[in-house]
Amino acid sequence: MSMSDPIADMLTRIRNGQQAQKASVTMPSSKVKVAIAKVLQDEGYIEGFSVREGEGKAVLDVALKYYAGRPVIERIERVSRPGLRVYKGTDDLPRVMNGLGVAIVSTPKGVMTDRAARASHVGGEVICLVA
């Protein structure tokens, strides 16, 4: 059976892995998942990620990050989902925790944070919120 929301599955694996104090989590890879992982790494929410070939399919390994024994990601939640897509213009992009967190947005210029989207004057689909 195929997965209906692979991005929500990715976010859930990261959330569950951090609650279980895992060093890393693995999941099936895709271009969008790699782009989201790159944004999370650039913002300092994960240690890093790598894509490797496993059993004929690409696998994404995400190295989780902790500070003083606690997960760096306090909250990660899906906003736009297959049943209800959420699109926002430049001026309507959400601010997470008044700028302390990030919203990950899929724009015509690629996947980026809400701050980068505002600076580029582009809107798009709000994928998730991370704090």
Curated annotation (Swiss-Prot):
<keyword id="KW-0689">Ribosomal protein</keyword>
<dbReference type="InterPro" id="IPR047863">
    <property type="entry name" value="Ribosomal_uS8_CS"/>
</dbReference>
<protein>
    <recommendedName>
        <fullName>Small ribosomal subunit protein uS8</fullName>
    </recommendedName>
</protein>
<dbReference type="InterPro" id="IPR000630">
    <property type="entry name" value="Ribosomal_uS8"/>
</dbReference>
<dbReference type="GO" id="GO:0006412">
    <property type="term" value="P:translation"/>
</dbReference>
<comment type="subunit">
    <text>Part of the 30S ribosomal subunit. Contacts proteins S5 and S12.</text>
</comment>
<keyword id="KW-0687">Ribonucleoprotein</keyword>
<dbReference type="GO" id="GO:0019843">
    <property type="term" value="F:rRNA binding"/>
</dbReference>
<dbReference type="GO" id="GO:1990904">
    <property type="term" value="C:ribonucleoprotein complex"/>
</dbReference>
<dbReference type="Pfam" id="PF00410">
    <property type="entry name" value="Ribosomal_S8"/>
</dbReference>
<dbReference type="GO" id="GO:0003735">
    <property type="term" value="F:structural constituent of ribosome"/>
</dbReference>
<keyword id="KW-0694">RNA-binding</keyword>
<dbReference type="InterPro" id="IPR035987">
    <property type="entry name" value="Ribosomal_uS8_sf"/>
</dbReference>
<dbReference type="GO" id="GO:0005840">
    <property type="term" value="C:ribosome"/>
</dbReference>
<comment type="function">
    <text>One of the primary rRNA binding proteins, it binds directly to 16S rRNA central domain where it helps coordinate assembly of the platform of the 30S subunit.</text>
</comment>
<keyword id="KW-0699">rRNA-binding</keyword>
<comment type="similarity">
    <text>Belongs to the universal ribosomal protein uS8 family.</text>
</comment>
